[in-house]
Regions:
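Feature marks short, surface-exposed loop/turn motifs that line or immediately flank catalytic pockets
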Residues: 18, 22, 80, 116
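Active-site metal-binding core of divalent-cation-utilizing nuclease and nuclease-like domains
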Residues: 67-103
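Mg2+/Mn2+-dependent nuclease catalytic core
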Residues: 115-133
Length: 162
């Protein structure tokens, strides 16, 4: 089973490579639209980009590891049989790699931002809490900003250097 940071870094890197190779339109469509119409930049949703990243992550994970008891979920708000919460607030992480219905295999939580909306303070706080809270204890947390190109992608791992 995958549980080493290096393995996660490799799969994340390869997933980003595939995303930028096959789905660059999702990331750069706003720029193209701005050239065609006289309007503010109209970008695709972060969710659509994260969905494709998750698709590639799962594909690569299943290819490399034969134990398929872990799940990749996008915008997942469940905690066992309840809603995922931090204090009183309902939370919905962008991407989690875990075993559904259990909290013992919470491997990775990622929050994403896009180059046109890159404010990360709230996301970093959410990751910190999901990694530290006894109820969740994700082994790893990361914040990823999708850049205009693959080379511009910014990945920060928890604990964050401030």
């Amino acid at each position: 089973m995958i549980n080493e940071k290096k393995d996660l870094e490799d799969i994340i890197g390869l997933s980003l490579d595939k995303l930028y190779e096959k789905d660059i339109y999702l990331i750069k469509a706003g720029e193209n639209i701005k050239k065609l119409v006289n309007a503010d930049v109209l970008h695709n949703s972060e969710r659509s980009i994260v969905h494709r990243f998750a698709y590639y992550f799962e594909e690569l994970y299943k290819e490399k590891y034969k134990d398929h008891n872990l799940n990749i979920d996008v915008e997942y708000n469940r905690n066992l049989y309840d809603i995922k919460r931090l204090g009183e607030d309902c939370i919905i992480p962008d991407f989690i790699f875990h075993e559904r219905g259990k909290n013992k295999n919470n491997i990775l939580v990622i929050e994403f931002k896009t180059w046109w909306n890159s404010e990360q303070a709230e996301d970093k706080e959410k990751i910190k809490k999901l990694c530290e809270e006894k109820e969740y204890q994700y082994q790893y947390g990361a914040s990823i900003i999708f850049g205009k190109s693959r080379e511009e992608v910014d990945i920060k791992w928890y604990p964050f250097d401030e």
